[in-house]
Swiss-Prot record:
Keyword Transferase listed: yes
Quaternary organization: Heterooligomer of catalytic and regulatory chains.
Family under the similarity heading: Belongs to the aspartate/ornithine carbamoyltransferase superfamily. ATCase family.
UniProt keyword list: Pyrimidine biosynthesis, Transferase
Pfam families: OTCace, OTCace_N
Gene3D superfamilies cross-referenced by the UniProt entry: Aspartate/ornithine carbamoyltransferase
Residues reported to bind carbamoyl phosphate: 50-51, 100, 128, 131, 258-259
Record-given protein name: Aspartate carbamoyltransferase catalytic subunit
SUPFAM superfamilies from the UniProt entry: Aspartate/ornithine carbamoyltransferase
EC numbers on record: 2.1.3.2
Length: 296
């Protein structure tokens, strides 16, 4: 089924066949003209580096152009204009809208308001579908396969939308097992656990590490904690460094959606396990592939 003109709000909106078509396009994508004469609106109501820059780069490399903002304070939202009116205005100017917002459901609301396709660049704590595409593409590109692997997901599994989307994306495949590795206060919400279709269990890093083919690490999402004291209790409670990796399986891939704070030590960067900078670089070809598939 074609994604042309479709909204991409959750990774659950994507079929495995769609995802693997995006992977194939991304693996050969360096330049193109699919967006020639098209304008993409970048509606970033929340800070971003990699996501915004890679969407902008992807648009330019496909021959398109972009408009937008990187902070709500620089728009009429600062004067009291509503989110709805802002989206309607962007819809009248652009052929597609990329939305990032701190509030859950913002991208879905934008999709209901706009005629142009809306791509969710991360909203709330549940959805970051294009990050999940990049994560899975990185594994697929290196391994050629995502099935029958053992995954560990380490970090903030309660407030981290990248981790939540990664886990939901794995539902499209057949992992051997998934280990959820997190402090007690950062365990996933029950809704996410109930949605998982693969074998999973809670573990600690030391016990799970020797089995892992992929370790997906995320930072503690300080900005999403409702109570600052809750953040203080869990910050710094986990760290991957080169000493713990002595027990790692040969060929282990360590991924991180970035930015990192202190959850992966700098000494890991020079090990053969570090794939997170390759992962970040994959943002441009994957988003090029997605834009070329979605924008009418």
């Amino acid at each position: 089924m074609s994604l042309r003109g479709k909204d991409i709000i959750s990774i659950s909106d994507i079929k495995r066949s769609d995802l693997e078509r995006i992977f194939r396009v991304a693996s050969s994508r360096f330049q193109g003209d699919e967006l020639k004469g098209k304008i993409i609106a970048m509606a970033f109501f929340e800070p971003s580096t990699r996501t915004r820059f890679s969407f902008e780069t992807a648009t330019l490399r496909l021959g398109g152009n972009y408009i937008g903002f990187e902070a709500a304070q620089s728009t009429s939202l600062a004067k009291g204009e509503s989110f709805s009116d802002t989206i309607r205005m962007l819809d009248s100017y652009a052929d597609g809208i990329v939305v990032r917002h701190s509030l859950e459901g913002a991208a879905k609301l934008a999709a209901e308001l706009a005629e142009a396709p809306v791509i969710n660049a991360g909203d709330g704590t549940k959805n970051h579908p294009t990050q999940a595409m990049i994560d899975l593409y990185t594994i697929w590109k290196e391994r050629g396969n995502l099935d029958n692997l053992t995954y560990g997901v380490l970090g903030d599994l309660r407030y981290g939308r990248a981790a939540a989307s990664f886990l939901k994306a794995l539902n499209l495949y057949s992992p051997k097992k998934v280990y959820l590795i997190c402090p007690e206060g950062l365990r996933p919400k029950q809704e996410l656990l109930d949605s998982l279709k693969m074998p999973w269990e809670f573990s600690d890093l030391k016990d799970a590490l020797p089995e892992l083919d992929v370790l997906y690490v995320t930072r503690v999402q300080k900005e999403r904690f409702p109570d600052p004291s809750e953040y203080e209790r869990v910050k710094g409670s986990y760290k991957v460094d080169s000493s713990i990796l002595k027990d790692a399986k040969e060929g282990l891939m360590i991924l991180h959606p970035l930015p990192r704070v202190d959850e992966i030590s700098l000494d890991v960067d020079s090990t053969p396990y570090a794939y997170y900078f390759k992962q970040a670089a994959n943002g441009v070809p994957v988003r090029m592939a997605l834009l070329s598939e979605v924008i009418p």
